[in-house]
Amino acid sequence: GLGDVYKRQELPCRIHLFQGLPKGDKMEMIIQKCVELGVNEIIPVAMKRSVVRLDEKKAKSKVARWQLISESAAKQSGRTIIPCIHEVMSFKEAVNYAKDMDVKLIPYELCEGMRATKEALSGLKSGMDVAVFIGPEGGLEVEEVEKAKELGIIPISLGKRILRTETAGLAIMAIIMYHLESGE
């Protein structure tokens, strides 16, 4: 039935990507690829090192455009839902929005080794809401990571190489997808 199709096409966990606002049109590629990989919603976040500053009118038209990109990527990849692209949030609003999610992760280049990543992923269960915070170009400020840690967001590593902001979201999505679907 329909429920089976839904189950087959969608990840067993809902992934919420909090993406630090990148420069130029990188966000379009991030949205397209993360939608292909199964993300549930994407929240653009104005972080300390985000170079881009969008006024309200500009932000609205950007988000509308991003939503269309999400729609076409969802259709093209056979998704049964269209991931929502949220209005731009501040870091404070974003961590508050994520506070009740089951697992909250923040890839951070100063995080040593993959053990924390493995442990965090091993706790994922079907039906969970997973928040993933990605810094913009230039990464996360130390105080953003500290604030995140205070709120139960776990710093993880995505490997020994420093990833660009547009690569980090894809990497964590692919890792989560593999982890959740490798038993099938």
Language-model region placement:
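RNA substrate-binding interface of SAM-dependent RNA methyltransferases
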Residues: K7-I106
